[in-house]
Amino acid sequence: MSNPFPAHFLWGGAIAANQVEGAYLTDGKGLSTSDLQPQGIFGEIVTRQPGDSGIKDVAIDFYHRYPQDIALFAEMGFTCLRISIAWTRIFPQGDEAEPNEAGLAFYDRLFDELAKYGIQPLVTLSHYEMPYGLVEKHGGWGNRLTIDCFERYARTVFARYRHKVKRWLTFNEINMSLHAPFTGVGLPPDSDKAAIYQAIHHQLVASARAVKACHDMIPDAQIGNMLLGAMLYPLTSKPEDVMESLHQNREWLFFGDVQVRGAYPGYMHRYFREQGITLNITAQDKQDLKATVDFISFSYYMTGCVTTDEAQLEKTRGNILNMVPNPYLESSEWGWQIDPLGLRYLLNFLYDRYQKPLFIVENGLGAKDKIEENGDIYDDYRIRYLNDHLVQVGEAIDDGVEVLGYTCWGPIDLVSASKAEMSKRYGFIYVDRDDAGHGSLERRRKKSFYWYQSVIASHGKTLTR
């Protein structure tokens, strides 16, 4: 069997500033929305007081240990590392006229370290960590002013790193703003849909402005969007279930439609009309939105099912995406259903819809790891999960889908986004820290470290099909 992965395919991992860096007030950094949710994106929003602490304040101390960690990534053979720039390191309050030089200098050092090993950076401009100053003073993305603040930030980092970064993403999992409005757009969790969609509109305009700025300032760079790829199957072949899956998938595909096609799709006009939502969209907004992305990136962890059956729906109360379990799939320790074939399906679906290159920028298994008496960590469950998903990526490439690369989520253990846990481990590299923040922060290679090293070295030929 021929190897489907093209020669230019990028292999690596993905991390986010607020989940790895720590140093949460170091070198002039301001408070972010992430700092006000020390228990994760679905946790309570708290006011930070001097002397209090959250696990993300130190995280895995990547801010100080990045040379060691990047050396480990290089040992695995990474050709790409997805990171995010903490907006609050560059503009601590979000609305300053001038950037924070100490923050800019940190990422210069980080990119130089990656370049030393030939690892290409893939940089997310905003990954669940907008400046809290913009929320407190201006109402977050509910205020049109935030568009200008984001554009200033984007132009600042484009100018600074134009020779070091050639692939960019605007907003991480932008469609999650519907379900986690404080994390996504800086609005209170109980905000009504009209307010959330208006904030999302401002975010979409800001994303498009960043795309245009990138194209103007770094002509040889590419910039993409980033979606949470949550494909929802109909639970049954009942036509009502099939139609419901169409409606619910459009809830997140809407973001891609705007960012790829440059205008609001017709089905959203109907939705807004029926919901009584009137957005403030200016003629300039419509013009700005025409700046479309070069490629589509997405996270993929699971699929789900949807139904119109009220008895089945009752089981989903409190489920953020109103998914019902798929009876044909197994689940992880955290209840996330495992569906490798769903990744091939999603890749084909998105490519058929948009005809744009795709980049899988998050995929991984959160699990509890055990250190054996000899110090080894035998995470065969993680190897099996990643192997099966990568096999399906290869199948999608054989199907004719253009896939730029694969950066698995959490190549090193980090603080989980949803509940700020260390025990939910994704990494090939173990970090000695627990949910209470105790531990030496020592790094240790897991069995999966050597497995991924082999996969990359063979360009996917060692995958078990």
UniProtKB/Swiss-Prot annotation:
It catalyses: 6-phospho-beta-D-glucosyl-(1->4)-D-glucose + H2O = D-glucose 6-phosphate + D-glucose. InterPro entries: Glyco_hydro_1, Glyco_hydro_1_AS, Glyco_hydro_1_N_CS, Glycoside_hydrolase_SF. It comes from Dickeya chrysanthemi. The keyword Hydrolase applies. It is an enzyme of class 3 (hydrolase). Transmembrane segments: none annotated. This is 6-phospho-beta-glucosidase. It comes from the Bacteria. It holds the Pfam family Glyco_hydro_1. Disulfide bonds: none annotated. The keyword Hydrolase applies. The active site is at residues 173, 362. PROSITE patterns: GLYCOSYL_HYDROL_F1_1, GLYCOSYL_HYDROL_F1_2.
